[in-house]
């Protein structure tokens, strides 16, 4: 059943689908010419989750069965029921029970992951039936590394699904042996030492799970390391580490135990009672207990693994750091936070749109975007002036003169992110949107506050707290500080023309800076504006002539400074910054073309003949010996046969015009024509054999066919093919890619990567979209229902429309030119795109695809911005199973995917089907996408009850009923539209276009900038930053490189062959004369040594760290310095 939509939304979907069908028609016509591995387009379209699962699993009739189950039960329950039905033979046909059980478990995982990720195929390598010691049959599930892409819940429920299938098919529980238990313990701890786990289980937790789990959690080897203790076990097939079992047990069953328990209880399963012990032994998701929360305990986890060149912007909860503000702008939410663009600029451009910050709370990380309706930073200049910055221009102007950044400004985080992370609220500051609701409770009159006098008058008249705009950071002072400041001003200050003038005195100056009061310093005198003078005197209980109104009032004041100020000024003064958010830089934003390593134009093998560059031109001129034919090379490719003329070849298209088919055979027995296992030796058959290819002739013919000359620098192929049938791509495609300077990916497509940023509303002006073009795209009205007439109106973004970077447009223009040439010159069809400038790309369709997934999402380009990021609706990102905490995805032109993608090019190895568009989602159904998007709040303002709840440290779920969330709109037309936001922003691409981390040159430059910024930030301890950089980045690097140098291989510069030790001849025996060189050089080992010692001494890191560096320096010197021959000069003997 299609999702409910309004007429306008339905018209939008139909418009996208009509254009898709037009594209597919053209691609199908091209494919039918027989020049590609398949005569059909190889990306099937899917309308819903059920369709996607059926395509991925390849079981006819599965989609209808899934839809039937989902009508009656939840997603999780439906996944289990479908699995049971497959295992019992109600859906699909299989050769034996084992295959049916395997399909059942994989299908359950596919349903749980919305049919988007590759985990069902790649993460579950096999499901087998095996025997217990008592002869009963149990189920064994083999997990592989890609199961991680399914997420913890799906990992855990895959085990539950296998148990459900076991029960339905009458099989016994797994009965583990004691040695196997201890093997699990050793193996998971070994995996933790070589790879990352979100949670490290205790030995007892591991033993509890594996002793009681009713199915066997097994896996294929994923690491080279082997266990040392429990080796060569009868029922364990490998001694190598199996990463899949560690992921499923640690990140799946243990971390998601409460969710698994909920389903176990609902299904009334016995044998899972041990989950209660796991739940009791694990920490609650929120992290802190109530007493700790009420103190807002700082969390320093985000500072772990600090990297050189990526600054810390605030230590945990430290004054001067980012001030939390609750709300959602049109470009925040879904794990994205916003700060003022002036904050980005004043921090030396290290933060740009899309830059990832590791944050203290509520989650682990967030992408950053500009929101100029927030408060900007406050800085102190070298001349002592304090400036509150509210725009980028001012930030750029004063940046060279800043001596300290006193306050980073505000950071906006939405309610939905706290709900998603189940993080207990931290207190909200008293903000304007709260003050307005306080005032509305007192009067229905329209009240304007344009001066401090009016602000105090309104507070006195209506009994509301002082307006936040006129409230200083009193909570950062002690009551003693307040009393001292009042007495100092009364005794030493004077007022001229309404401006307070104070002699510069260290403590009072420092207190005024902590309060973030703008000030000037002239002739050793601090000068405050008339407005700030009025506010400060009122708050300190001083008369206009600076005399104390009531000298006795300063005795017995409340210990909280802001409460003490309330008592002195006679109106309630609220806390402006009860919570600060610590942060450091994570990944820089990304907007870059996707390349294989090394970059490739065509998936055509050139072997050693192509040299280090894999050049087709070099291969065309290659001759192994004087007697060999020039341009003839020997490479491994698949044998194919033309059904029309019977000719054997390696190409997809036969010279006679026929479309060839692969011919499988046994390499040992010589039997051919049988796919599967050889009937004689029982080894797998393969079409792949070494064959001689006339590259020179092929290349010349391909150039002639597409009407091009060999005038490009290099046409790059691959050294060898790694697909199952080793099918080469037509050279003509590579020639046209080289002409247009675009590069192919492993599946035949051309991609462009960008950081994910959410957007629910846009202004046509900011994305370069004219009003006429916007209307043409279907944007007839703005978000408030008014006809669209101005490029400054705010429009609500359709769920499958995307906005790309200008850099992306430059590359996609080249891609479109390549595709038009391909259609015209290779397929003999009319050009399709005919684009010449950026604006021509608007309205064209793309495929969005995330790494580790196998389902693309249909999208439409509607504009471009200067930021290095890709903007799309949160639903678009969620449909790819991504959020926006710094993730990056790719786009490809739709025609490119339909024309050039082929399963025949995908690597034949674990993970080969990941990051490939095996299916295309045509229409986003909010009910079928990642549930994190359901927690996005879509209201114009948060109610007062929300702010009060934050002050009481309540859980986000306690206020869910009063918040307007996407989850409450599911199943209605409002699930797509009518979204609102609490805070506006004038330009989604404001601030720096790129992070300074990307624009600075060497690592030394980046490190210097990082530490210099740390010196200026009030919220940062630069000594701690220096120590963390040395301990978490430089020391491990130095030690690792030193180890790598001593165990390195040698490499031939000519053919690339590697050797464990240098050949005695000094040249490469394989290619006969290539120079053999080191793969790890002295410079790689010593590159961080000097800079580490320099910053260790400059920043006064602990002596233990300095001693570690000095010992390492001695080790490096002993390795590289020659003690026997030392250059001496005359001065050495004087």
Swiss-Prot record:
One of its GO terms (molecular function) is DNA-directed DNA polymerase activity. Its EC number is 2.7.7.7, 3.1.11.1. GO terms for biological process: DNA catabolic process; DNA-templated DNA replication. Pfam families: PolC_DP2_cat, PolC_DP2_central, PolC_DP2_N. This is DNA polymerase II large subunit. It catalyses: DNA(n) + a 2'-deoxyribonucleoside 5'-triphosphate = DNA(n+1) + diphosphate; Exonucleolytic cleavage in the 3'- to 5'-direction to yield nucleoside 5'-phosphates. Heterodimer of a large subunit and a small subunit. The gene is polC. Keywords: DNA replication, DNA-binding, DNA-directed DNA polymerase, Exonuclease, Hydrolase, Multifunctional enzyme, Nuclease, Nucleotidyltransferase, Transferase. NCBIfam families: polC, PRK04023.1. Possesses two activities: a DNA synthesis (polymerase) and an exonucleolytic activity that degrades single-stranded DNA in the 3'- to 5'-direction. Has a template-primer preference which is characteristic of a replicative DNA polymerase. Belongs to the archaeal DNA polymerase II family. Coiled coil: none annotated.
